[in-house]
């Protein structure tokens, strides 16, 4: 099984997600460091519900589509992994460079896990309905 295409696609999407993460990090700093795991899982829930709503109704009154919500799911997921690793705090305690390094480390772990699972499951996810994720 050749997973070169999958790895390239993953990296392209992660570049897009990281770019947005870096922009928000520049604007707001690592303000998410104060969020508890329950706050982050609520954000993931809200994004998944919005995707489902857009899929079912086909209507967005705020003018944003589904793709930004999937990007948010990825970024909130990585933020969640960072928070689980470092714990939540009462004040921002990391600089943008450290936040990006943590982001990159977790994104790399996700890629490596995906490649291992792709081997074992023969990329079965490619045959799944996208709505299975929401």
Locate predicted features.
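Intrinsically disordered, low-complexity regulatory regions
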Residues: 1-134
